[in-house]
Regions:
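Cytosolic, membrane-interface loops and tails of multi-pass inner-membrane proteins
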Residues: 13-33, 89-106, 203-241
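Intramembrane alpha-helical segments
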Residues: 107-181
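Multi-pass membrane catalytic core of lipid/isoprenoid biosynthesis enzymes
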Residues: 33-38, 42-55, 74-81, 87-136, ...
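Alpha-helical transmembrane segments and their membrane-interface exit regions
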Residues: 83-90, 142-152, 194-204
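Helix-coil boundary and interhelical linker segments in multi-pass alpha-helical membrane proteins
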Residues: 52-80, 122-139, 173-192, 262-266
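N-terminal transmembrane signal-anchor/hairpin module of polytopic inner-membrane proteins
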Residues: 3, 11-38, 43-44, 71, ...
Length: 266
């Protein structure tokens, strides 16, 4: 974005439009680009990393008991389930509910994507419960509830809050990843889930500010007066750049942490 125009006299900074894209990772609208944007790629990778982290925290005994192929298979299945439920299903429902990403994807396509992906995730869960541990079936309705309640803002949006975001997309993936490999839940699972919840809350704090500026602010005006009497123009990019840089780095760091834990297990 170019710097804001200044009046010929008085040094008054005119209002300038904010950044045009609804999200820092959003592509130009139309065609296949809408579907890429719909996936929220950096955030989806971030939250899938929680599943991997949880699975890799399972005790050595669980990995030995299942044999490496079996353990990796279960962790892969859990990750695939979350990729469907969160990466596709939840985001399709979110876009259906108010078009926050401003895509041109038809409503019927969004409904189809959400239905097929969420049902696919549930099917993976059922297979896991039948072939591994029956109690894992309890996680299926919990996950289904979280996807629907959060993204459709059920109960007047009561579940569409910072805390529920941290629990649903931070703590729950860690728990499921661990349970998929270990077949149970232990103290270390709770600690890792707390880590994921707190990190997700940090994500939410940064992303909420960015969303507000990108999607709700129509113009920005003003300037910063520095201690040395210099003045710098204030625009939307200055308001969002620090938070977006933090989000980029945190998403990358979480993916690298998950990759590190995979390498450790290998």
């Amino acid at each position: 974005m170019s710097p804001p125009d200044r009046a010929a006299e008085g040094g008054i900074t005119r209002a300038v439009p904010p950044v045009s894209r609804p999200a820092w990772y959003a592509l130009e609208r139309g065609g296949w680009r809408d579907y890429v944007t719909l996936l929220h790629p950096p955030y989806t990778a971030w939250h899938l990393s929680y599943v991997v982290i949880g699975g890799c925290l399972a005790p050595v005994g669980a990995w030995e008991r299942l044999a490496p192929v079996g353990a990796w298979g279960r962790l892969g299945a859990a990750t695939a389930a979350f990729a469907l439920a969160v990466g596709v299903g939840a985001h399709a429902l979110d876009e259906l509910n108010g078009r926050p990403l401003r895509t041109k994807i038809p409503d019927r396509v969004l409904v189809g994507l959400a239905s097929v992906s969420v049902l696919g995730a549930c099917a993976i869960g059922v297979v896991g419960a039948v072939t591994f541990e029956a109690w894992l079936a309890l996680l299926i309705p919990i996950g289904l509830f979280l996807v629907l309640a959060y993204n459709l803002e059920l109960a007047g949006g009561r579940f569409h809050s910072d805390v529920w975001f941290g629990l649903a997309w931070g703590g729950f993936p860690v728990l499921c990843g661990y349970a998929a490999v270990a077949g149970d839940v232990r103290g270390v699972t709770v600690l890792a889930a707390v880590f994921a919840v707190l990190l997700s809350l940090a994500q939410r704090a940064l992303s909420s500010h960015v969303r507000h500026v990108r999607r709700r602010v129509s113009a920005v005006r003003g300037e910063l007066e520095l201690t040395d009497a210099r003045r710098e123009p204030l625009d939307a990019r200055r308001l969002t750049a620090p938070a977006e840089a933090g989000l980029r780095l945190l998403s990358l760091a979480t993916v690298v942490l998950a990759a590190t834990m995979i390498a450790f297990r290998i």
